[in-house]
């Protein structure tokens, strides 16, 4: 594997010693430096593997950055477009605010993190029994509150309307005693109990966001539907209050419910995680985690903060830079797990193929099966430089995505013949890459721009069956051998890519091995710093 962010970061580090910023170089120049760096370490690792006694065809290794490999990868990608499985959409994905790129499920690791744990009361528009009424929510991500568009409840759950210091608070009946114990308060009386469905449709005011400031930024549909209580199957009564703050731009479940009720995935952040317009002025330019204390202070000042504490919990971190990631809605390319093609879905067909493979040890089957069953659509785009580009064009006139099979084949042929492989995509103009006189199939336009995102490196490695095994005359590999972390990595990426392209698993059997660890049980195959 010769592409990816670790190499970009290493090259950036070398450039910084010379006081050179990556942004000051043309993409082609930066990619050239990445290629040189990768080649240098391919040779070093090759020598080390030989010294260790590892057997391999060392004179003919396959490299994911070779023109032949990259050309095959582009053809494989073209098949997903041809079947209608690849699509572009704005929805929440893991986002590293330090590396400024989307990340996939296989690129996050969970570590303990300390965060605020706050209860906030949202004022309802209507009074209850002549008293000001509030929907009380719990969150560990105060920085997502500026993007709040709704509150979710469990339809068939019981909710208590309780009187507290002359106000009416709404909390799930099942969580009532625990909630008041947590906040160190008591309630005067229960006015009545209602079902969650009875709360649906109630409107509320945002504690610190002005509706008028969102006009011109959010759609009319969103402005009309936001700041109401909505039913959701994702609400649990394990912790919190049974009322869940919904930010469709910052959570997968929030996005699913928001889409159902025409609430757009709103996320007023830039790539480095700083708030931008139309976020409230007091947090503009502030990074998400730094904004927590400012938001909490304002809630306290306005009287909407019910209780504040700290919590240690398992939180996703970037596997490369080890910093916490966020969920952020951005336009990305996805491969759909449940899109129907030829009467099948990628998810369904992959699960069928898992049953045909021999898994050693046997627990590997259930492990990968549960991961495929529960995984979201595969986010395949990355906002970086060193990798295989997503080779589609956009019509400048109508915005149509150009994804013709013939165009993919033409690009793959150009890549195959170029010594720098996919560097040709970055060196040539759309006019030089597209067939002469090419016109947009939708509007007849003749002006195009190239997609700038690159492919997830897991798509790179997942293509090895097509780039290496099949050219040797084999339909599939007898054995894939790797560590248990690859059930969500290489084993899974290879399975999805092969099933999407050929309708079958790329391997007959999969063997999972363990790890050499240090005295604390940490894998020594990774940096221990």
Swiss-Prot record:
Gene Ontology biological process: isoleucyl-tRNA aminoacylation
Pfam families: tRNA-synt_1
Annotated residues for binding of ATP: 526
Similarity-based family: Belongs to the class-I aminoacyl-tRNA synthetase family. IleS type 1 subfamily.
Assembly and oligomerization: Monomer.
The record's note on its domains: IleRS has two distinct active sites: one for aminoacylation and one for editing. The misactivated valine is translocated from the active site to the editing site, which sterically excludes the correctly activated isoleucine. The single editing site contains two valyl binding pockets, one specific for each substrate (Val-AMP or Val-tRNA(Ile)).
Protein name per the record: Isoleucine--tRNA ligase
Organism (species): Aquifex pyrophilus
